[in-house]
Each structure stands twice: as C-alpha cells, then as structure tokens.
Amino acid sequence: DLTESVATAEEVYKTNKEIPDLLHKTCVGGLDFGSVRDFTAVGLLFREGDDYYWKTHSFARKDYLEKAKLKPPIHEWADKGLLTIVDEPTIDPRHVVNWFVEMREIYNIEIIVADMYKLDIIRPLLEAEGFNVHSIRKPSAIHGLLAPRVESLFANNNLYWGKNPLMNWYTFNVYKNVTKDGNVQYLKKDEHRRKTDGFQAMIHALYKASEVLTDDVDFFLDELHF
C-alpha cells in the first residue's frame, strides 16, 4: 500500500487564516461521535466562492487525558475554547446536541452529516431538536470520492479553519492510504495517540457540501426530492 500525509505542513498552516463573519450563512454540520471514551468532534462547513471555512469544537474526557498523557497541550487548547474537557464515563451526546442548538442561533444549519456508528444514540436527540441528519453507512467509502477535492482544497489554499492548533493536530495525524486497487482511505497514523476526530467530522460535512453549499440555485432545486 502507498501511504502519505493528507497535506504538507505548509498547506496545513495556511488554513489558519482568520475566518470571516459568517453570521446567518448556510452551512453543513459534521460530526464524529464514534470514540465517546476519548474525543468527539463537531463542526460547521461554510462556502464562499471557491473557499471553504470550517468552524469546529471538540469534547474530550478528563480521565482519558490523564491516562493517555498526550504530547500536545490539550488543556491549553481547552483554555482557548477549542475544546471542552468533560468529567464523565463517556462523552454525553447532549454536549453535541447542545453545541449544534447554540450554533443554530447564529448560522443556518441545513443538514448534519455523521457516520452510522453510534448514530442510533444521537440521531433521535438531534432530530428531536428539528435537525436534518444524514448518515454515512461506510465512511471509508466516501474518502476516495472526496480525495481529489480534499487534495485540491489544501493545494490551492481554499480551506480555512482559523487559528486552531487542535485542528492542525487532527490533520497532521491523518495519512492517506492508497490500496492496491486505487482506493483512498484517510486513516490514523497511530490508532491510540493520534486523534483525527475533527478531520473526519469535516470530511463528513464535505460529503454533502457540493449539494448544499452551492450558488447554483436551479441546480440545487433540481437535486431536491419534494
């Protein structure tokens, strides 16, 4: 198998450009809720022209952080508001739901995209709040589909998430695995110590971005099934 980083260090650091005012803008929600014993990530993906903006937040378990002793300054990032450290046996799905509810007061969340794993727990809670939830049955299957766009967004400097070292870390922890049959998979460089939740949440949102975040209204209406 061929392996490589999903983006160069220079490309990742270029994403740290300040995000513009996106008040009331339409966006796609992304969610990675699979690892409720360590990290969970949520986010909103916006588009303006060729540029995409990713506003994200994470939740991490206090007990996990104490035992894992990760190298990055997680507590410092928490102080900056990039993530919330919770003291509970597993990450309560209501943290995720409440975050999207709060964001809905500021932005127009068209849809929330997540993988099927553990979605049975959180989907009813999101739908009870009136959110439209789309599930991805096999996340790795969409990686190959999105790989050309992901590569282009990084290479052409069209993706931004503001000054967010946590998101940088997530992205540095991803490697692009190309299988013998040419399929692309975004995998963790280390299964236990290299978290990728924020990146995977963004990939989930990107899956629906071309359908929802478009300037071509006629095309969008054609795609809808009333």
Residue ranges of model-derived segments:
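Gly/Thr-rich phosphate-binding beta-strand-loop-beta motif of the actin/hexokinase/Hsp70
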Residues: 22-54
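Nucleic-acid-processing active sites and adjacent nucleic-acid-binding tracks
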Residues: 46-111
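Metal-dependent DNA phosphodiester-chemistry modules and their immediately adjacent helices/loops
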Residues: 125-215
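ATPase catalytic-site recognition across NTP-hydrolyzing enzymes
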Residues: 1-29
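Flexible loop/turn segments at secondary-structure boundaries
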Residues: 2-3, 35-40, 50-52, 62-66, ...
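Short His-Asn-centered micro-motif
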Residues: 33, 114-117, 136
